[in-house]
């Protein structure tokens, strides 16, 4: 049975996981065939309108084309039927539109244009819709992270570098750091839209030869009608550096979500246990064989799909060097790339919003881990204090380093080793050392930094 017969019979044939497992209805609706056809028809309508305004085609023809250039009249099934014969989707769309137009209006469809004027401009409309959805979800995630930063502004935890305990920080700092990064993605998208959301009505090789002297006016007017930026120059296609930038921006977003996911997963390790994603113990099952498991599956899915999104950058970058004025190698690739990158990015953003909102900070384990190294995370503070009190900084570093190594090897508390060191005790009393070893009083300006991030980001307008 041929694919078209299967589709016509109503038999489901979902193959790709974005058809049944990943993606939101909102983003899927953008990239479904019906909407793509709608956007192509919208471009044809804008072209006819612009040409009629400039006296290139009859006004009555443009009005009829604009009336009928919709999936209300032009059916996807009919376009597919024609495409079986033409082996060309844009020609099939043009003929299907011409069939429903009254009089001779159909003769003026696609006047002076080439297929990719329609396809590329329609894709820009689809990308614009996708960006709007992604921007909205980025704002949601940023605001949730800011709320978490405020909530945990004073939740002191161990900072880790190289996977090892470093010095104290706060969970407020971590959440604020992520919020600031998400906000930068909003900035990037805002700045890049003028390069990404563009239109092109320039003809077979970009010279506008078929459009005549009014070609530039038509080109600019179509962009105005559609709410896009007209490209400055093109050949037969909008240049793919623009599309590669778009895919790369979504991959950057995915990698930020990956970073958040990696941290959550690491902090949910049994022996760390500081963070935990939402888990419903009344129904949810973590393993088919280990009844006790509570796995960070939401953030694992985010991390896994971020790899797929990242891989799409390579495919789209390979679409930049097309032959001369263009070849068709980008077309088949982009039928996969654009839908996948948008649907998957939207999907993991949706997961991140829910996952971060319900994320639990286990403060008991956070407190336990602060003492896990028996005071070693306070070594920097002791060194700095000794330097402030007159011991040379380099000397202080070496003395505290030796004390820290001894504490580590003997599995003793750093404070006890320091109390035994005569050089250290010349500068610090026992009572002072007791206070200096408190990790909760060594978080620097973390609360103020978090406040500054919250204030700055919440006052931003996009």
UniProtKB/Swiss-Prot annotation:
Q: Which NCBIfam families match?
A: purB
Query: Which parts of the sequence bind N(6)-(1,2-dicarboxyethyl)-AMP?
Result: 21-22, 87-89, 114-115, 236, 288, 293-295, 332-336
List the SUPFAM superfamilies hit by this protein, alphabetically.
L-aspartase-like
EC annotation?
4.3.2.2
This protein's assembly is summarised as: Homotetramer. Residues from neighboring subunits contribute catalytic and substrate-binding residues to each active site.
InterPro entries cross-referenced by the UniProt entry: AdenyloSucc_lyase_C, Fumarase/histidase_N, Fumarate_lyase_CS, Fumarate_lyase_fam, Fumarate_lyase_N, L-Aspartase-like, Pur_lyase
* GO MF annotations in UniProt: (S)-2-(5-amino-1-(5-phospho-D-ribosyl)imidazole-4-carboxamido) succinate lyase (fumarate-forming) activity; N6-(1,2-dicarboxyethyl)AMP AMP-lyase (fumarate-forming) activity
Q: Can you name this protein?
A: Adenylosuccinate lyase
Q: Name the species this protein comes from.
A: Methanocaldococcus jannaschii (strain ATCC 43067 / DSM 2661 / JAL-1 / JCM 10045 / NBRC 100440)
Pathway assigned to this chain's UniProt record: Purine metabolism; AMP biosynthesis via de novo pathway; AMP from IMP: step 2/2; Purine metabolism; IMP biosynthesis via de novo pathway; 5-amino-1-(5-phospho-D-ribosyl)imidazole-4-carboxamide from 5-amino-1-(5-phospho-D-ribosyl)imidazole-4-carboxylate: step 2/2
Pfam families, A to Z? ADSL_C, Lyase_1
Q: Which family does it belong to?
A: Belongs to the lyase 1 family. Adenylosuccinate lyase subfamily.
Write out the entry's keywords from A to Z: Lyase, Purine biosynthesis
**What are the catalytic residues?**
162, 287
């Amino acid at each position: 049975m041929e694919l078209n017969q299967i589709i016509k019979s109503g038999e489901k044939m979902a193959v790709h996981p974005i058809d049944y497992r990943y993606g939101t209805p909102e983003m899927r609706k953008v990239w479904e065939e019906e909407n793509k056809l709608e956007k192509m028809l919208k471009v044809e309508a804008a072209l006819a309108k612009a040409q009629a305004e400039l006296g290139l085609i009859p006004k009555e023809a443009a009005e009829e084309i604009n009336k009928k250039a919709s999936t209300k009249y032009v059916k996807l099934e009919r376009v597919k039927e024609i495409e079986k014969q033409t082996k060309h989707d844009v020609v099939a769309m043009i003929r299907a539109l011409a069939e429903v137009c009254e009089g001779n209006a159909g003769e003026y469809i696609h006047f002076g244009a080439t297929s990719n004027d329609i396809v590329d401009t329609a894709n820009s409309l689809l990308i614009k819709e996708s960006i709007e959805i992604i921007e909205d979800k980025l704002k949601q995630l940023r605001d949730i992270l800011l709320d978490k930063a405020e909530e945990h502004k004073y939740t002191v935890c161990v900072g880790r570098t190289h996977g090892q305990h470093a010095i104290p920080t706060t969970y407020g700092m971590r959440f604020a750091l992520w919020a600031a990064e998400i906000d930068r993605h909003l900035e990037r998208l805002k700045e890049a839209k003028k390069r990404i959301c563009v239109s092109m009505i320039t003809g077979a090789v970009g010279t506008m030869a078929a459009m005549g002297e009014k070609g530039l006016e038509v080109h600019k007017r179509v962009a105005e009608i559609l709410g896009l930026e007209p490209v400055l120059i093109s050949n037969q296609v909008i240049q793919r550096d623009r599309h590669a930038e778009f895919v790369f921006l979504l991959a950057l977003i995915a990698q930020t979500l990956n970073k958040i996911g990696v941290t959550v997963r690491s902090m949910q390790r049994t022996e760390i246990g500081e963070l935990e994603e939402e888990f419903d113990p009344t129904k949810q099952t973590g393993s088919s064989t280990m009844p006790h498991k509570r796995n960070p599956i939401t953030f694992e899915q985010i991390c896994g799909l971020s790899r797929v999104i990242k891989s799409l950058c390579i495919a789209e970058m390979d679409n930049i060097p097309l032959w001369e004025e263009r070849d068709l190698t980008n077309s088949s690739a982009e039928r996969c790339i654009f839908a996948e990158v948008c649907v998957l990015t939207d999907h993991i953003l949706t997961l991140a919003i829910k996952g971060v909102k319900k994320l639990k900070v286990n403060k008991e384990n956070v407190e336990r881990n602060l003492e896990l190294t028996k005071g070693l995370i306070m070594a920097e503070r002791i060194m700095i204090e000794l330097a402030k009190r007159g011991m040379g900084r380099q000397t202080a570093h070496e003395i505290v380093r030796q004390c820290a190594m001894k504490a580590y090897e003997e599995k003793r508390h750093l404070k006890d080793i320091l109390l035994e060191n005569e050089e250290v005790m010349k500068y610090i009393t026992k009572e002072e050392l007791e206070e200096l070893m408190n990790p909760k009083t060594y978080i620097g300006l973390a609360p103020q930094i978090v406040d500054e991030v919250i204030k700055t980001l919440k006052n931003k307008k996009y």
